Every structure is written in C-alpha cells, then in structure tokens.
C-alpha cells in the first residue's frame, strides 16, 4: 500500500549522469538480494547509528513498514546491459529514507540523482513541501546529498536534524 489514492509507477526513470544510468523499480516483495547491504556495519551505522547487522526478519519488517508508508523502490544501476539493485529508497511527503547498499558506489552522486528524481515526483503529485524525518549528525553523506538538493535543517532531533524542502 503506497501513498493513499496514488498509483505508484513500476519504474521511475532517472536522467543519465555521465556514464551512470539509474532507475527506481517498484518494490515487489522480493528483497533477499538486499540482505548483504544490511550486514555491513558501516552501512547499518549510517541508518541506525548502531552496527548490529539486520536479520532477515528485521529486514522484512523494515520493508513491510516502508511499503505501507510510501512508495518503496529499489535503486538499480545499468551494468553490462543488466539492471542491478544497489540500494533502496522510500518516498512519501513526510520522509525519504535512502540507502546506497553498495559501499563502492557511495560518494558518486547516486543519492543526489535519486533525490532529484523524487523531488520531481513530489512536484508531479502537487506537494508544496517535502520532509526528511531525521538525518543523523554522523551521516555526512546524507546531509550533503539532501542539502545539495535544497533541503534545509529546521528542527534538532536527539541524533541529528529534521529537514524540509519548499517546492
């Protein structure tokens, strides 16, 4: 159940940046390939501020929650004419959690490409504002990604800041 009353696209295309071609593919209930992303302590720390790997049960609960709150997508990159999942993102007006699961792809602008496309999605849906519920102070990559897209911190939280973008 994505956003109430809104039909979630199967695919959201993202404009190519240099040699990088991405797309967002609608969550279909299959996520075993993503488990390895959530085993990496550095990745988990960026998400939770902790380093304990996710169990399959926890991963399933996370994806079920996200799928019931917004439009859940896998971020896919085109490699050798094949679409390969490299992360996930969920879009709804109140939050936009994103994970680039492949650590070798972080810092290359993939997150910015995804966030720009989801800002466009928000505009298509007529939203006047978009929010990020919280970015931990230690997650400099995520802070940089959302700031680059125009999001501004507006409220301090226990571990970081809430962000808002006026559309």
Language-model-derived ranges and their functions:
Residues 106, 115-123, 147:
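A conserved short alpha-helix in the GNAT/GCN5 acetyltransferase fold that borders
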Residues 74, 82-95:
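Conserved beta-strand in the GNAT
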Residues 122-135:
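Conserved GNAT acetyl-CoA-binding A-motif
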Residues 76, 95-110, 135-136:
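A short, internal acetyl-CoA/4′-phosphopantetheine-binding micro-motif in the GNAT/acyltransferase core
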């Amino acid at each position: 159940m994505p956003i109430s009353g809104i039909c979630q696209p199967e695919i959201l295309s993202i404009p190519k940046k240099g040699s990088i071609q991405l797309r967002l593919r609608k969550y279909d209930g299959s996520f075993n390939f993503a488990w390895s992303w959530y085993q990496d302590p550095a990745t988990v720390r960026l998400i939770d501020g902790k380093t304990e790997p996710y169990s399959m049960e926890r991963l399933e609960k996370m994806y079920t929650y996200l799928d019931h709150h917004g439009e859940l997508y896998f971020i896919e990159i085109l490699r050798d004419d094949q679409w390969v999942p490299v992360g996930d993102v969920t879009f709804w007006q109140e939050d936009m959690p994103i994970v680039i699961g492949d650590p070798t792809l972080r810092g290359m602008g993939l997150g910015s490409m995804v966030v720009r496309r989801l800002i466009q999605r928000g505009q298509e849906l007529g939203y006047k504002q978009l929010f990020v519920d919280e970015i931990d102070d230690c997650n400099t990559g995520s802070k940089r990604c959302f700031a680059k897209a125009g999001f501004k911190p507006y409220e301090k939280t226990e571990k970081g800041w809430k962000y808002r973008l006026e559309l």
